Amino acid sequence: MKYWNLKKINQSSLDKTGVIPRSISKLFEKFKKELDPNAEVEAIEEFKVARYQTIASVKYVVFLFIIPVLINQVSKSFLFGPFINYLWNRDEHIIFLNHSQEERAFAELQRFEEKLHFEILIGKIDSPSSNLINYKMTEKALELAIDYANESSCAITNILADLLSIAIFISILISSKRQFSILKSFLNELIYSLSDTAKAFLIILFTDMFVGFHSPHGWEVIIEIILRHLGLPESRDFIFVFISTFPVILDTIFKYWIFRYLNKISPSAVATYHNMNE
């Protein structure tokens, strides 16, 4: 029965993207159900299908995201982490992975030196001497070397663990096509059940967040975090080129989706979106 229900759900999702507007098709479907003598039995059956679909989708989403995250953390702590730390610490002369780390380390050391001289000028450090200053600078330099060596080894560990998690995620998707089909049908039902105002609100929220006026600042922070997470150089030119092109491409794809699909599925939602966006 579950396979038959899945086929029925997928067929209903396909019907919603047909030539006839969804509002008219829903009206005819409502009349058809009201005249059907088996309407009560079908209503109970649809409730069972919806309940099974919801439970299966929630379980699949939890499994789909929790397993890769757990594997990522476990592999970093017990597999890649100790191995990379051992190899990286064997050569004490290798500290930085890229020039961005060097620039940040030198900037921190320079700020520490300026702070040290400021404390000497205001009398916070009693009887300052060149030996004391050299000792404190050496101590700070060693501290920075340890911190950035750990950051470099963690970046390599992150790359390996992330690749493993992505491989696990893709393998789960490939090996669970039926569960993915159920999830897709559930999301379609969830989206189509929203009111036109809710759809328009979500569209505006999505566009303003990712392609709106203030989105470049958010993209800049996200790209810097990703580059630092993977140990890649934080090139300002690359970041500026990305935030000046990717949101534009995303906005073009989104507008094409509205024109090509959403305008056929729910024209009233598109009209509400334009009214709210004005």
UniProtKB/Swiss-Prot annotation:
Subcellular location: Plastid, Chloroplast inner membrane
Disulphide-bonded residues: none
Alphabetized UniProt keyword annotations: Antiport, Chloroplast, Hydrogen ion transport, Ion transport, Membrane, Plastid, Plastid inner membrane, Potassium, Potassium transport, Transmembrane, Transmembrane helix, Transport
GO process terms (BP): potassium ion transport
Any GO molecular function: antiporter activity
Pfam family, one: CemA
Protease in keyword set: no
Similarity field: Belongs to the CemA family.
Protein name, per record: Potassium/proton antiporter CemA
Species per Swiss-Prot/TrEMBL record: Gracilaria tenuistipitata var. liui (Red alga)
Lineage: Eukaryota, Rhodophyta, Florideophyceae, Rhodymeniophycidae, Gracilariales
